[in-house]
Amino acid sequence: MVDTESQICPLSPFGDDDLESPLSEEFLQEMGSIQEISPSIGDDSSGTFAFAEYRCLGSGPGSDGSIITDTLSPASSPSSVSYTPIAGSADDSSSATLNIECRICGDKASGYHYGVHACEGCKGFFRRTIRLKLAYDKCDRSCKIQKKNRNKCQYCRFQKCLSDGMSHNAIRFGRMPRSEKAKLKAEILTCEHDLEDSEVADLKSLAKRIYEAYLKNFNMNKIKARIILAGKASNNPPFVIHDMETLCMAEKTLVAKLVANGIQNKEAEVRIFHCCQCTSVETVTELTEFAKSIPGFSNLNLNDQVTLLKYGVYEAIFAMLSSVMNKDGMLVAYGNGFITREFLKSLRKPFCDIMEPKFDFAMKFNALELDDSDISLFVAAIICCGDRPGLLNVGHIERMQESIVHVLQLHLQNNHPDDVFLFPKLLQKMADLRQLVTEHAQLVQVIKKTESDAALHPLLQEIYRDMY
């Protein structure tokens, strides 16, 4: 999580050259092929996983990169038939309303002809062959009969008519026997139910995979934070930082490593800003490892992986930050400290403006009463966003996000059945987060220009560069 202080290795002060020189691809390579973001971003530590098994169940990918929010329906059945309910009684429906394919060539069947469902073309072909007693030149190639080539090999077409059950003794034009229709409908419903069960199982598996990756990769989550904030933790309560004196005490104990190497001699606002950056860098690394657990992410072009992280990490950070916040303050240093909201507001400008918008967002976000399983899918949807600038494989990323958003929708329906508007509310929060990150990036640029002692970490500087 984004604790204001954390126990990680100290960062030495940055020189002017670090701030002004552009971080090119060469710099990223010096960081170990973007190892600064992740020690193994090029490795698929999650193992091989075919994202295609979580196919999009919606009405089709959006062309503008927006999130698909319309009602999503099960994918079409792999069988040759699908049932479309129509008005009227079952007896009134013809075989055409069942949208059945011709058993011979796959074209749309016009009815039940000579004992099988067949199109007008194959019905006429079989009738002519029988009535005229036509004999075709033998073919040993076992030609595949399809709509586009059904007239090329008449011998194989006739053999397929016979093998699929067409018979002159079973003449019946147009109408299907009621028993046959009832049997067919039962088969269709069974197939659809089996398919839906399979799809639901796949979606649950995806949700479980993402949730487990979330719990594994982040050192702080909502359930842990709520236990600490409620005073129910088994260990000592967090140390409260509410003024300069308690801040200095915390810097000597909780975050002593972060304020070494000359940082301790700078003013309090700069020290706090430095600690915020340290925690942000750590969370970017956690988010990168989490992203690699999202099916399909590690198979993306490396440029697309970096782009998704560049534009998505701060939106994800501020969403997860809400978990450690309440109206009075926020947990820091892995839950060992609690810095008050009023103290952060008392800092001099522009530093006093950093956290207050995050508290405002957190109060509204926490009102949705999401748990970690909800948040994990929400964060995954943020990362896999197909409208980020500079993406190469937009279509694949959009399909990834559509699948995750669909899983999120179904998960919310199951996890929060009484809040029917929770899903659209959460989609709106994605837009709110973009605005929050834009304002934050603008404030950071102001600090960079006006505060000579408040140096930016190189990784965060690269993330902010040309962001918005």
Curated annotation (Swiss-Prot):
Q: What is the scientific name of the source organism?
A: Phascolarctos cinereus (Koala)
Instruction: Cite the NR LBD domain residue spans from the record.
Output: 239-466
Name the segments for region: Disordered.
1-20
Q: Where are the zinc fingers (NR C4-type)?
A: 102-122, 139-161
The record describes its post-translational modification as:
Ubiquitinated by E3 ubiquitin-protein ligase HUWE1; leading to proteasomal degradation.
Keywords on record = Activator, Biological rhythms, DNA-binding, Lipid-binding, Metal-binding, Nucleus, Receptor, Transcription, Transcription regulation, Ubl conjugation, Zinc, Zinc-finger
Recorded family membership: Belongs to the nuclear hormone receptor family. NR1 subfamily.
Q: Where does this protein bind DNA?
A: 99-173
- List the GO terms this entry assigns under cellular component, sorted alphabetically: nucleus
Location within or outside the cell = Nucleus
PANTHER family (alphabetical): NUCLEAR HORMONE RECEPTOR, PEROXISOME PROLIFERATOR-ACTIVATED RECEPTOR ALPHA
Protein's UniProt name = Peroxisome proliferator-activated receptor alpha
